[in-house]
Amino acid sequence: MIYILGLNGNKMRFDWSEYLNLAQELAATNSDCSGNREAKLRSAISRAYYSTFCLARNYLRDIEKDPRLFRKNRDINEHQYVAKEFIYHPTQLKNMVKIGENLSRLRELRNKADYEDTMFNLQREARTALMLAENIITALSKLTE
């Protein structure tokens, strides 16, 4: 579990939705330097993914009590596992399946942004990543209502 220190020095759990806020700021920032702009858009995609991945993982771990996500030395690819657990969830609720599908799609965008030397339509890809992230977070919040 990751904690940050609050103003009074007490441990606080990190709010992963803050990564989405950062992603939105990065994507909205205009820059005259094209290299800097590209770095911001790529970072926006990456932060959007990690925001939703961590929230989805925590839902499975903390709400669904998934035992595989409690272990320190995991024998799974956590990124694939979390998405597939939503897609193939025993309830097969439409919301659950959509979360998994959107998370997989967002991960593909994140991998391109983090590892590909050239990325086409970066502005559009960043908008898509933010939309997917917002949809995932909305769907996750509906599951906990």
Show the residue positions of the predicted features.
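Terminal alpha-helical segments
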Residues: 1-145
